[in-house]
Amino acid sequence: MALWGGRFSSGPAGDVFALSQSIDFDWRLAPYDLRSSLAHLNVLENAKLIEKSDAGAIRKVLKEMQVELAEGTLLPSDQDEDVHSALERVMTQKLGPLGGALRAGRSRNDQVATDLRLFAIDHMLQLAEFVIALQGAMLKKANEYKDAPAPGFTHLQHAQPVLFGHELAKHAHSLDRDLSRI
């Protein structure tokens, strides 16, 4: 789907189009774009800016696209400039002109910002799960080695002996602060 228009009689030269394409790296935003599109559809429907029957048809296609994306059968084409144009192209193929109805009331910049926020939240939650798993593993080992002596360090030099279990528990506990900042 061409994003170019207005006073131009044709699209950009091939090299310019290739330079402006971001589909190679922003396709990972597709699940978030579909989620934000469903939310935007709800807003349009609740504000009565889109007919209930049209909203139902769009919602059905968006959910089908989520399934296809998860299955790996929904893919961008070489002609898609970015994730948004790719998904709108598929919507328009499936729904005709109704597929472009989701453009109402939202800018491309807002769409990008929302998708990136959802992406970041999702990945931060995954990171938090990894940190919690690491803490659990460290505390399990801390209990296992609660009586094992180990060399303590201060200012990068050997200091008094400590219990290895205490060292592990100390580091596991210090990750609590990191978790609170995620």
PLM regions and their residue ranges:
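A helix-coil-helix interface module used to build multimeric assemblies
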Residues: 1-182
